[in-house]
Amino acid sequence: MSRPPPTGKMPGAPETAPGDGAGASRQRKLEALIRDPRSPINVESLLDGLNSLVLDLDFPALRKNKNIDNFLNRYEKIVKKIRGLQMKAEDYDVVKVIGRGAFGEVQLVRHKASQKVYAMKLLSKFEMIKRSDSAFFWEERDIMAFANSPWVVQLFYAFQDDRYLYMVMEYMPGGDLVNLMSNYDVPEKWAKFYTAEVVLALDAIHSMGLIHRDVKPDNMLLDKHGHLKLADFGTCMKMDETGMVHCDTAVGTPDYISPEVLKSQGGDGFYGRECDWWSVGVFLYEMLVGDTPFYADSLVGTYSKIMDHKNSLCFPEDAEISKHAKNLICAFLTDREVRLGRNGVEEIRQHPFFKNDQWHWDNIRETAAPVVPELSSDIDSSNFDDIEDDKGDVETFPIPKAFVGNQLPFIGFTYYRENLLLSDSPSCRETDSIQSRKNEESQEIQKKLYTLEEHLSNEMQAKEELEQKCKSVNTRLEKTAKELEEEITLRKSVESALRQLEREKALLQHKNAEYQRKADHEADKKRNLENDVNSLKDQLEDLKKRNQNSQISTEKVNQLQRQLDETNALLRTESDTAARLRKTQAESSKQIQQLESNNRDLQDKNCLLETAKLKLEKEFINLQSALESERRDRTHGSEIINDLQGRICGLEEDLKNGKILLAKVELEKRQLQERFTDLEKEKSNMEIDMTYQLKVIQQSLEQEEAEHKATKARLADKNKIYESIEEAKSEAMKEMEKKLLEERTLKQKVENLLLEAEKRCSLLDCDLKQSQQKINELLKQKDVLNEDVRNLTLKIEQETQKRCLTQNDLKMQTQQVNTLKMSEKQLKQENNHLMEMKMNLEKQNAELRKERQDADGQMKELQDQLEAEQYFSTLYKTQVRELKEECEEKTKLGKELQQKKQELQDERDSLAAQLEITLTKADSEQLARSIAEEQYSDLEKEKIMKELEIKEMMARHKQELTEKDATIASLEETNRTLTSDVANLANEKEELNNKLKDVQEQLSRLKDEEISAAAIKAQFEKQLLTERTLKTQAVNKLAEIMNRKEPVKRGNDTDVRRKEKENRKLHMELKSEREKLTQQMIKYQKELNEMQAQIAEESQIRIELQMTLDSKDSDIEQLRSQLQALHIGLDSSSIGSGPGDAEADDGFPESRLEGWLSLPVRNNTKKFGWVKKYVIVSSKKILFYDSEQDKEQSNPYMVLDIDKLFHVRPVTQTDVYRADAKEIPRIFQILYANEGESKKEQEFPVEPVGEKSNYICHKGHEFIPTLYHFPTNCEACMKPLWHMFKPPPALECRRCHIKCHKDHMDKKEEIIAPCKVYYDISTAKNLLLLANSTEEQQKWVSRLVKKIPKKPPAPDPFARSSPRTSMKIQQNQSIRRPSRQLAPNKPS
């Protein structure tokens, strides 16, 4: 008879108990991983994972999946409870927003429970996932959480919700160093302090194996005591073993970025920590000078200066910077191979710039800071800028239709500095100690329990037989599962094909909508153009009406003519694009139809597969029910066996526990022995070290004594040398006489120089007279110009004829416009027709979907009926299968399944036929049921027989139990003996503990000895220091004796006295001569300064006169045009001229352009400031006035020659990256020659010119390689030229500022236009102007472009030099921020 299978262990299960030694150690390791806050699977990470899964799955579309729905039902409530218990944003009161960035904002908050103040940083999850390469928050969190450095801003808590990440940091009320530099003029003493703190802070970051890469004053915050801490570690990067970093993108702020980091954007991204020291050099320069060393208005200008730093780095003459400070800045701002700090921070610390009496490197944080912030309360935010409220809508994740995992990238972000979860409690410690005692007590049990293993072997054989039976059942199950998996994979492949087609369909629909949008856009453009044409017609009619009273200039007509031509050209292009759009729309509609047909086919296939799947699922359910019935029978039979085997299992567990206890006690014994040996080794090592250190100190003392004796011997030698020096004094007297002669010659030279200066002054007087003569000549020219006015009236008659021709052209253009209108109407009709077609298709699609849903509903009803009938039939079949052979049953089942498949396929054709088939099937099932009932009676008979057999088995097992009771009694006796052995072991353990205490006492003695040795060492070091000081004092004393003058005993005393008298006389003469010379020099210097000031004043007066003359010329021009208009009006009224009269010339009112524009002012390094000026453009000059009163008084601020204009263009964000983004559409740039400018005084520093070798010359351009992180397009191919993180290589001309892809140059494409600006850069200037609106900007640009001369102006070698050179602040002078009175230092 075969034994029934047991329900105990599965095959292949380990025989050892779960509480053995190896298992416990694994559990402890696992517990350590969970407790470790740096571990990726710590408690907070696990909770984050569960929370994220629930948030990502809790959507209606995903809940349709049964497994997901079960998961959410199980964990949704507990996760909500966890969220309520964890830290959240509602635990804090927001005081104020103190900062805002691209990913979120920084808030000043107060914790409701503790009332502590923090700075809380919010990062939007949506924004970070939307932008690629934005996992910067991990580095920032880890550095602030685990740095434990006083130079790094600390992170207290990090938590998250479904929309934001939150970082609760310490609040730094002193603000950043940008605020400090804008409020104070930073002296060198302060700069020394803050630079030292930055160096120490960066050294702390570097020691963690990281490079900051964005060191700037914005990221340097001051605490309440005024000391510095670093912040914003989003750009930090881990160094490799060599201390280097590999990165292909330029990271950092333009003004502070190093040349090697800039080069990395080309692909050579290989640099080390030295890039941070470059930024420190820029920061130090900015503190001392008030501006960054490589400042430029454009991004390209800044980058070109950084790359050419050897030539572009210069110090202002008016800035008070010490030699050591300049040396340090130059040492930082050099090539990375020789940069200071490359070999370690000690290089920087030893630099003489940092020598001072107030602090040293070890105690700098304990000393008083230069500026201690004055705080009114703990929430004082006066040192931060006021941030406007963000009223924009916050973007969130859209509701997904499939699993997206938006919360998964943020798992593990949560962090608490005071982590109380799973902390070691006293109860845990007590249980651990009890467990260890128990383990120690059962050491010896293992030896005596080996005999019991023989008794258990018989039982294991029976168990193996049962396991084999289980395996056979499992193989059958696996076969059925494989068949199911094959069907599922087939279905998945079809579904994926369906999804692909749906995607293609969606793409085509999107393209169709895009083309439709473009067509609408083109139609709008067309309407605008028509409106423009109508407005132009209206303007023409107005002009005709005005001509009846007065003649108007022809330039207006020419301008209108040009505009008409442009509109015609635009209309033609619009019509072409509309035709193209029509074609593409037709093609897309065809593709949509094809896709819809494919979609229908796939949906049919999907229906077939779903029916097949349902059949397979039903079969699987039947098989499972059969399996369950088999398992019930098995469990019923095995319950009896389990009762019998329960006691055996208990004995097995006792045996295994005994083994575990034994192994643990042995391990502890070994560990104690090893620890004892280690302590003895440490003791011996300590003794050796102490003896060695004592020997070293003694040797150093002996060396010092030897050196002391040597110095004494040297001093004796020097005394002898001193006596020989006295003899050489007579020779020194002769040298003094020679010096006197040289002084006299110098005096003569100075007098000659003064004569030359007087000659120059006389020449300048002549120049003044010549300038006055020129003014008289200009007045004469004015009279000549009045005569020219009369001649211009003759030209007007010629212009009347031209006007008639333009009117005829206008008529022709109106006809063309009408034809274009007709074509547009046709396009609209066709478009409407296409839209109707699209609507019909969508309706048909909706109807088909409804029909499919109805059919699915009917199918489900039929399937429910089938399942109900099949349930009854399967119950009977399962009872029959238990007694019949499995092979026969499977063949029958296969036949039945095939019949069902055919029936289900027939059901799809017609629902009525399916109902009939199901009825006939039910009749056949009833017949089968009656047969099964007959077979059931036979089974009951067999069941009675089986019960009798089980009773016999019970009797046998009772006998076996009595035998096993006897064995248990014997085992209990052995257990008693084992307990006595355990007691003995406990005594041994106590002895070992006593030994351990002795060892610990020895260790403490050793430590005391070590402390005493350290004290002796300190004493010796003090003695050494005193010896050194005595030595230096002796050397200094000897040097003093050496330099002291003593009368020489030997030789003739009278000769010496005589020579001394002569010497004194010569000294007196020398002094008198020097005094005379200095007086004369002071006198002549005063005269020279007065003359120079007079020249400067005269030149300034000359410039002002020239400027007033220019403004008067423009006034004369305006008056002349008005006079001309009056003459024309009189002529027209007398002659009675028609609408075709002449209009004015280029110099008359219509060509005159005037209005308010703003010029840039450098108030701050970070942003532009603007000053309004009233600007007038005449035929020859562009005049800038401070106000309208200055205009009336003819007192211009600046004048530019129109002949010297090179180029006028609107700017982009990269040209003026310091300006506000809203202002960019209103800014335009003027390029002009240097000599074409007259100005009252200098306000903008001239940028120094770099070497030409850094530029790529092509078609007159001078291209600079760069990268754009702001929105910019290529002006050659009009494709995007920018990317936020990985922009493509680009070029920008430093003359005309055209931007293009570098590939166009590399591939030698001819699409780049030639440079519009041909001039020498050394004589060229550019000027930025801000209009009141974008329309005004366009008007100014279009009008000024027409004024540019066709041939570029040649620089005039005899022309006057730029007035900037006369009255300007020199090129390298500093522009310091507006300062306020320095606050006195306060003790921290």
UniProtKB/Swiss-Prot annotation:
Effect of mutating residue 1194 to P: In a metastatic melanoma sample; somatic mutation
PROSITE patterns: AGC_KINASE_CTER, PH_DOMAIN, PROTEIN_KINASE_ATP, PROTEIN_KINASE_DOM, PROTEIN_KINASE_ST, REM_1, RHO_BD, ZF_DAG_PE_2
Residue runs in coiled coils: 429-1024, 1053-1131
One Pfam family per UniProt: PH_MRCK
Keywords: ATP-binding, Biological rhythms, Cell membrane, Coiled coil, Cytoplasm, Cytoskeleton, Kinase, Magnesium, Membrane, Metal-binding, Nucleotide-binding, Nucleus, Phosphoprotein, Serine/threonine-protein kinase, Transferase, Zinc, Zinc-finger
Start and end residues of each Protein kinase domain: 92-354
Subcellular location: Cytoplasm; Cell membrane; Nucleus; Cytoplasm, Cytoskeleton, Microtubule organizing center, Centrosome
Domain AGC-kinase C-terminal: 357-425
Processing after translation: Phosphorylation at Tyr-722 reduces its binding to RHOA and is crucial for focal adhesion dynamics. Dephosphorylation by PTPN11 stimulates its RHOA binding activity.
Region (RHOA binding) residue spans: 979-1047
Residues of the REM-1 domain: 497-573
Its EC number(s): 2.7.11.1
A single cellular component GO annotation: centrosome
Regulation of activity: Activated by RHOA binding.
Modified residues (Phosphothreonine): 414, 1212
Annotated segments matching region Interaction with NPM1: 373-420
Record note on quaternary structure: Homodimer. Interacts with IRS1. Interacts with RAF1. Interacts with RHOA (activated by GTP), RHOB and RHOC. Interacts with PPP1R12A. Interacts with EP300. Interacts with CHORDC1. Interacts with BRCA2. Interacts with NPM1; this interaction enhances ROCK2 activity. Interacts with SORL1. Interacts with PJVK.
Protein name: Rho-associated protein kinase 2
